[in-house]
Amino acid sequence: MGPETNYAKTADGAHIAYQVVGEGPLDLVFVMGWTSNVEAMWEEPDLARFLSMLASFSRLILFDKRGVGLSDRVSDTDFPTFETRMDDIGAVMDAAGSERAVVFGVSEGGPLSMLFAATHAPRTLGLILFGTSARFAWAPDFPWGSTEKYWRDYLDRMDRSWGTPEFARWVVRTWGAPTRVGDERLVTWLTGYMRRAASPGAAIALLRMNRAIDVRDVLPAIHAPTLVLGRTEDPDFPIEGTRMLAERIPGARLAEFDGSDHFFWVGNQEELLDEAERFVKELGDQEAELDRVLATILFTD
């Protein structure tokens, strides 16, 4: 049995499903990739363990982005803009009673988190990024992006087989978790998870939106402490794009790990969690010191 699911209501009336787990000293908003279902996530043991570990040193806030999972579905032909989905992070924080938080974005959740950190600086205590990039499609000045042929083939495959064991095996083998090829337990969970996370039309609409993602221009405007995490052989997001993030976000710290799995909870999750915990605790210490200094000033005044 997973945590209780609640709903945040956005300014335009949409309902966003969210959960709050843990009682740590700092809030941590976890922004999932492409699609999600906050209740189905807890059914995968390794993913549940990863989330539980995050909740052991933070007050973890999970949510399904607008259009996927348990949040309000939208028309596949009129999908919300990237900026609208980014603003939903703030609505979830409001509903969860969070004034400021560390924002942790993975995969597609990365650019959403970057945009939030750049435009909502007072609410962003820190930023953690894993397995992501500021741009997704190939360009002459971004040779690590996916090619037009890749996008066409991917969309065609999704249209034919979204939510089937065949598609789940392909995801595991080609980019999600190559080290878990042959793991039918993972395939069975992923098959059901995809169906509960998004309809075929919604998944396709999201992928088309992802093809247009490019938030490189906002990177210099991110001033929150930032930790960038990446696996050196991630087949979905080459490490060169990860390094570019660390170079362009002022003061960002980069941590690279061996590994070829894109799914953050597969493989060397302990190393990722150790880095994340160290970073969050450093932020907590800084906040505590700032509070102490402010209290001293107020007392002496």
What are these regions (language model features)?
Residues 161-209, 218:
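Conserved alpha/beta-hydrolase catalytic His-Asp/Glu region
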Residues 222, 228-230:
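Short beta-strand/loop motif that positions the catalytic acidic residue
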